[in-house]
């Protein structure tokens, strides 16, 4: 039986370097990935190194609010 809320939630990961450089308008957009995380194992914000097609390199992608 499930207890309360779902343990696994869907989150969005956004490129942190594109967000910072968006003010300068150097890149065409902001890279976002959709994934899931377990709330019990990782209660804090998730940060992963993923490939950003706008920066053309691997950067840190941080969890954002929906």
Swiss-Prot record:
**Organism domain of life:** Eukaryota
Q: Which PROSITE patterns match?
A: RIBOSOMAL_L33 (PS00582)
Any Pfam family hit: Ribosomal_L33
Instruction: Say where the protein is mainly found.
Output: plastid
Which biological process annotations from GO are given for this protein?
A: translation
Question: What InterPro entries does the annotation carry?
Answer: Ribosomal_bL33, Ribosomal_bL33_CS, Ribosomal_bL33_sf, Ribosomal_zn-bd
Per UniProt, subcellular location reads as: Plastid, Chloroplast
**Does Ribonucleoprotein count among this protein's keywords?**
yes
Q: Which SUPFAM superfamilies match?
A: Zn-binding ribosomal proteins
- Keywords of this protein's UniProt record, alphabetized? Chloroplast, Plastid, Ribonucleoprotein, Ribosomal protein
An annotated GO cellular component of this protein is: ribosome
Q: Which PANTHER family match?
A: 50S RIBOSOMAL PROTEIN L33, CHLOROPLASTIC (PTHR43168), LARGE RIBOSOMAL SUBUNIT PROTEIN BL33C (PTHR43168:SF2)
Task: State the family named in the UniProt similarity comment for this chain.
Answer: Belongs to the bacterial ribosomal protein bL33 family.
Under what name is this protein listed?
Large ribosomal subunit protein bL33c
Give the species.
Aethionema cordifolium
* Organism placement in taxonomy: Eukaryota, Viridiplantae, Streptophyta, Embryophyta, Tracheophyta
């Amino acid at each position: 039986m499930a207890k309360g809320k779902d343990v696994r939630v869907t989150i969005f990961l956004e490129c942190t370097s594109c967000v910072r450089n968006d003010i300068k308008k150097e890149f065409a957009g902001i890279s976002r990935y959709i994934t899931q995380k377990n709330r019990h194992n990782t209660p804090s914000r998730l940060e992963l190194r993923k490939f950003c097609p706008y920066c053309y390199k691997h950067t840190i992608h941080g969890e954002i609010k929906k």
